[in-house]
């Protein structure tokens, strides 16, 4: 699909360049049935307000060509402020592995959620539709009436629900 309405337009451009560059570097796609190949997933995140992009390349094993691939994308897309190699060498269909290799100065992007600055790492849960999440969190805050109460945000990912109530709790 050349155009996906569920993602920012720039993701299609980055993906096309990712495929072109990886093909030129002879990086092969991972085959789940044979457990052969390098590239498992391309995972992109974009801050709704900041415009910052995180590039996460999920691989079966780290090879030098992955850094070259990342460097070329970083050169072409200044919006990419975070580039991470995630190594998943297990025979599983789970997307992310345990090992992360950070190729930039940070492993996260910054954005704003409900007037709070948040840092979003590749493994952190974060709502993909920021305006809808802000409306949902506002309704949850109205319902919870956190005025003067202690708010526990358990199993929270990036912590945005608790942060959205912090000013009134």
Language-model-detected regions and their locations in the chain:
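Accessory RNA-recognition modules of RNA-modification enzymes
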Residues: 1-169
